[in-house]
Swiss-Prot record:
The gene is hupC. It is found in: Cell membrane. GO terms for cellular component: plasma membrane. The keyword Cell membrane applies. This is Probable Ni/Fe-hydrogenase B-type cytochrome subunit. Gene3D superfamilies: Transmembrane di-heme cytochromes, Chain C (1.20.950.20).
Length: 262
């Protein structure tokens, strides 16, 4: 989409206090930007690789959570005959490992796109901790989610609260789960392999296998809680803030459903 899309995504940085956050809140845009958004109602934000990664990652996490739960709490055997003939847990473990590989490869692809994509592509990989404006907007969003503000602010990318959540639970969370997950895989694969060479140090650092399993399991529950809140917040904002959320991750366009943009 031409016009406001290109202007917003390719606009030069105007100052350290204005665009530390890639989200570029519309309430702080220029008068011309606001009028363009009013006329066109839509801004192209998320490129195709970002959207594909989002849904691939969501599917991989779903498989990892379900299979990971059963690995930690195996099903009681209800089969008749030898367990080796049924191989139920073997299939569950294989699905877990396969989904872990997919998530890992996709995450490295996402890191690559952060460098070559538009400025929204790298938003989740950092937090502008020294930007006072960011934290002011962060507090506002907290108040909005707790129903202490009457009107929402609208953002082109992630709002500051979502920005912090994505960095914490996706960027750091996935990194943590990959490191601990591959370390557990390396333990089972044995010494001398590639995974042991890359991740064998983790077990030594944690000091025992059970602690490593526990940390990985707790990380799973943290991501589950984040996913539930993430889905709730996306649907809530779609309805209450009058700007698209769910459809944006399908089409790539952020649609503003009314002209209340400040």
């Amino acid at each position: 989409m031409k016009g406001v899309s290109d202007e917003r995504i390719n606009a030069p940085v105007r100052g350290p206090d204005e665009i530390f956050e890639a989200s570029r809140l519309t309430g702080d845009a220029t008068r011309e930007d606001l009028e363009s958004i009013r006329r066109r109602t839509s801004v192209y934000v998320y490129e195709a690789p970002v959207r594909v990664w989002h849904w691939v990652n969501a599917l991989a996490i779903t498989i990892l959570v379900v299979t990971g739960y059963f690995i930690a709490s195996p099903l009681p055997s209800m089969q008749i005959g030898e367990a080796t003939d049924q191989f139920v847990m073997g299939y569950i473990r294989f699905a877990h490992f396969a989904a872990g590989v997919v998530m890992s490869v996709a995450f490295f692809g996402r890191i690559y796109w952060a460098f070559v994509g538009n400025r929204h592509a790298w938003q989740m990989f950092y937090i502008p901790i020294f930007n006072k404006r960011y934290w002011k907007e962060f507090v506002f969003e907290l108040r909005w989610y707790f129903f202490l503000e009457e009107e929402p602010k609208k953002y082109i990318g992630h709002n500051p609260l979502a920005h912090a959540a994505m960095f914490t639970f996706i960027t750091l969370g996935i990194t943590f789960m990959m490191i601990t997950g591959w370390a557990l895989y390396a333990e089972g694969a044995g010494q001398g392999g590639v995974t042991d060479s890359l991740f064998g140090w983790v077990l030594g650092y944690v000091q025992n296998s059970q602690r490593l399993h526990t940390l990985h399991h707790l990380g799973m529950w943290a991501i589950v809680i984040f996913a539930i809140i993430h889905i709730y917040a996306a649907v809530r904002e779609d309805v209450m803030s009058r700007q698209s959320m769910v459809s944006t991750m399908i089409s790539g366009h952020r649609t503003f459903k009314d002209d209340r943009i400040e």
